[in-house]
Amino acid sequence: ASKCTIMTEAEWLNPKTGFNKANNSWMWYLPQSTEGIANLVNFAAWRSSEATWGYGGKYVFEGVTSNFYNEISDTDWRKRAFVGPDAKYADYSDITNLTAAQFANLPAYANLKFHPAEGETATYSVGNVTDIPMMRVEEMYLIEAEATAHADASAGLQLLKTFMAKRDPEFSTSAVSSADVVEEIIWNKRIELWGEGVVFYDFKRLNYSLKTGYVGTNVPSD
């Protein structure tokens, strides 16, 4: 049996090691070394909003849609991994390596999930040497919950509740039918595995749609 354990809040939001260093949750990952590290063609340079040498921390600032952010429960601590529209530095200073001045340049909804190695925000030869997550045990729990829900909605929901007890102490849902429970599971899978290249395939498999055109959207039409 796997000895992997679900990431804790402290591990998830750690500004020095969060999603840049393999831990007991990671079942499979891609390690990088200092040999051959480039400044731009690199995971952290694109994904991290703190990599000030890269596109991710200078121009792109990868993040979520406003609709996505607003749908995350305020009691779900994973929401802190994304910069709120009314964000104040004091509310994020414990989970970011940026200074107050640098933080002020982040657009709303930018991610603070992926950090440069060692929390290094200026030197690419250090900050780009991260481990890249490929498969985490959390995905396995959510796959089990979905598979169960297709056959038994109540049992699948219970598995989700057990998982969510480690993410949102006040988690609740009105989902009852198998279809609705599966949708709730996939929604939390979207939050949990954002930026890890997983849920796109769930959307294709389940024939889900993604809406980006709505009043208040932060997705440009062009």
What name fits each language-model region?
Residues 62-66:
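Residue-level signal for threonine
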